[in-house]
Amino acid sequence: MSFSMTRELYTAKYGPTVGDAVRLGDTDLFIEIEKDYTSYGDEVIFGGGKVIRDGMGQDPLISRAEGAMDLVITNAVILDYSGIYKADIGIKDGKIAAIGKSGNPRIMKNVDIIIGASTEIIAGEGLIVTAGGIDTHIHFISPQQVDVALTSGVTTLIGGGTGPAEGTKATTCTPGEWNIHRMLESVEGLPINVGLLGKGSTSSDVALTEQIRAGVIGLKIHEDFGAMRSVIDHSLKIADEYDVQVAIHTDTLNEFGFVEDTIDSINGRVIHTFHTEGAGGGHAPDIIKMGAFSNVLPASTNPTKPYTINTIDEHMDMLMVCHHLRRNVPEDVAFADSRIRKETIAAEDILHDMGIFSIMSSDSQAMGRIGEVITRTWQTADKMKKQRGKLQGDSGVGDNNRAKRYISKYTINPAIAHGINTYVGSVEVGKYADLVLWQPQFFGAKPNMIIKCGMVANSIMGDANASIPTPQPITYRPMYASYGLALQRSSITFVSKIAFELGVHKKLGLEKTVLPVFGIRNLTKQDMKHNCETPEITVDPQTYDVRVNGELITCEPAAELPLAQRYFLF
């Protein structure tokens, strides 16, 4: 005998299903459920009088060794580059083992995920699950950045530095073997995944090679240490040899050549361009043209995203501090002025919406906010919907194509760019369970829970002396994956393949999971999910107007944004 219930009641019990749309925070963006794998009538939920009990939704006889999961997230809405759908997520040994229908196969059909006595449950009803964010532009200036990143939904940091040294505050490099090894040891105590970038600003093949062999996953070229043609060529040559990425912040002053010279020096080899618009640094005024090339993986940093009425004014102060400039030196002021252009900043929003710019990152404490990568990504998506309308292929209520495009910018695409997409970057079977759970009304602003390798690392939590978990003050608090040996077992340090083969992690006594990066040097922009367009981009050298395939692209600055003061008092 079948039983029917209203859609409203079904959603209240089990979360939304096919035909329902979910609003993302207070934005104008909606996602529609494309498929539901949870099997109507056999849904599993936990609690008093609910389904997950022995002999009911829980298999009464199965052991962990026989296939019971370690953790199951029930009835979650998954928002991923690969789709927007509802499913249960089974996690075992810290990895996503299955996505589909969970329960007890002895009494239920089509069970993909077996719940047993070994299984913990997280109730995902009404929640959105995404992959943990990946920020590829980290200045490791202060370890306190990690708490801010985690509580924003970012679980992987890629960048360079050694602390609040002038080199680190400007250039995102961990230079030389000694510094690299000390930083690899230091991040052992941080409950987050880390990959380090070495200093690429040298023409010495030996100096570049020793850094890659020491454990960095890529090289960073920065104009403050020099972004000359020879530097670019040598870094890319050594990167090709060892299969690591090269990230570049090009020559703002055009002292050693123009953007065309940099493009010529790159010579078709894959490269990851930081803040490709240019306010964060790079050939003035036309570094943005590099977004057109198939070998360039272009990224933005978040201070310019989205373009608002305050963007231009804010940037001058940031730039003077971050690049060790002085307001009483005319040349320093001129340098700063050359980088801040409203025309290219406005165009950058549209380049993201068109899928031309592929990655969003922070530039943490160095002209960027580590805790706002995700927020500003969705603010940009919302602004573009309001100013440009729906993306092609989106119809009705849903904005699924736009949602997939923007979620890719801080999950799968940065993972691909740095050769870690086999391990993290999406909600897919076989990957480490770095997952973020969101209440829809807080999506993009404040996550509910952050899971690292299948264990809760951080979460909103009430007063620890209360009789239940929910009394005020509710704040983010580190959870058990942030303590003891569980910290090392729940986080990953990425190194170059050669460093892994040389056993650098063993020589240093690292306890974290250490994994090699690979598959980088044959990448093209076509590998960037939902963000692979390569049109012609031109910049007028007098007016700074940006054109895509001959068409002027610009937009008005936003005077008001979602995911802002409604969510953050301070």
From Swiss-Prot:
Protein name, as recorded: Urease subunit alpha
Catalytic activity reported: urea + 2 H2O + H(+) = hydrogencarbonate + 2 NH4(+)
Pfam families listed in its UniProt record: Amidohydro_1 (PF01979), Urease_alpha (PF00449)
Main subcellular localisation: cytoplasm
Pathway(s) of this molecule: Nitrogen metabolism; urea degradation; CO(2) and NH(3) from urea (urease route): step 1/1
Domain of life: Bacteria
EC numbers, comma separated: 3.5.1.5
